């Protein structure tokens, strides 16, 4: 049994009008897991039309995985401005996914509210976009209309600045807020990041995976945050990816 699992839908992403590409938190997390050599498994879902291509892409990473295909693939189109602010549109929505996993540390990487059932595990990291992103087609909408029961059993909540502003105060054992190019805050302690001029897509997912891997290895929260920040900066600048199979 691997010590760490990442679960969530894969997505079909169109960035700045380019050709569609594989995306989603469970995909971007593999980049950090490969760089760290983590003992991990990916448990992902996609639509039947994308199954063959997405299965091949996951296989190339070298990370053990399960891929469940049914219905449609969640799809997004988005772009970034000069300071990294993202404009995003929901083009298609997949059916909810309820995976079974056996791991002590689980990263739950939803794309929209309600699209992944949070499993029971000793340590669960939940990405806050699964709380605030409305499952509706069109321009991405955020609100705080989520069931607070979703946080029951969550050990670590990872939010972006925008998500944190929507949710407001929250009571969880560990709170991680990412600030894009400005680093992150872990339980109130700010962690700086080395600025990198690169496509930031998936940086939050990589941070979450690296953070959880560090916690699983025994690091305390702030130490894990510093480790994750360094990993993401290195990955975005390609310093950890050279010579390795990666997404």
Provide a role label for each language-model segment.
Residues 60-66, 88-89, 103-106, 121-126, ...:
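Active-site regions of enzymes building and remodeling cell-envelope glycoconjugates
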Residues 105-170, 181-183:
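Conserved beta-alpha-beta core of the PfkB/ribokinase-like small-molecule kinase fold
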Residues 174, 194-247:
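Conserved post-catalytic alpha-helical subdomain immediately downstream of the catalytic base
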Residues 33, 160, 204:
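Short, conserved phosphate/pyrophosphate- and ester-handling motifs at nucleotide-, phospho-/glycolipid
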Residues 24-35:
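Histidine-anchored nucleotide/phosphate-binding helix
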Residues 22-25, 139-145, 192-193:
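Charged helix-capping and loop-helix junction motifs
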Residues 2-6, 11-20, 34-115, 119-123:
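Conserved N-terminal subdomain of the carbohydrate kinase-like
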Residues 76-77, 133-139, 186-188, 198-205:
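Short, charged, surface-exposed secondary-structure boundary motifs
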């Amino acid at each position: 049994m691997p010590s760490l699992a990442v679960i969530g839908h894969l997505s079909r992403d169109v960035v700045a009008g380019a050709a569609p590409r594989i995306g989603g938190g469970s995909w971007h997390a593999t980049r950090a897991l490969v760089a760290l050599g983590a003992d991990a498994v990916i448990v992902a879902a996609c639509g039947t039309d994308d199954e063959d291509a997405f299965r091949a892409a996951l296989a190339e990473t070298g990370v053990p995985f399960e891929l469940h295909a049914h219905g449609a693939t969640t799809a997004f189109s988005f772009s970034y401005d000069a300071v990294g602010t993202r404009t995003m549109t929901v083009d298609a929505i997949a059916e909810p996914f309820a995976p079974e996993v056996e791991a002590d540390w689980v990263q739950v990487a939803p794309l929209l509210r309600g699209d992944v059932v949070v499993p029971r595990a000793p340590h669960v990291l939940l990405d806050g976009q699964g709380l605030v992103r409305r499952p509706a087609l069109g321009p991405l909408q955020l609100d705080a209309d989520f069931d607070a029961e979703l946080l029951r059993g969550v050990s670590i909540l990872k939010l972006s600045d925008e998500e944190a502003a929507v949710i407001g105060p929250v009571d969880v054992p560990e709170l991680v807020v990412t600030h894009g190019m400005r680093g992150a805050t872990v339980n109130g302690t700010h962690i700086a990041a080395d600025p990198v001029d690169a496509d930031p897509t998936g940086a939050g997912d990589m941070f979450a995976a690296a953070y959880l891997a560090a916690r699983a290895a025994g690091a305390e929260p702030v130490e894990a945050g510093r480790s994750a920040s360094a990993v993401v900066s290195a990955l975005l600048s390609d310093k950890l990816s050279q010579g390795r199979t990666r997404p």
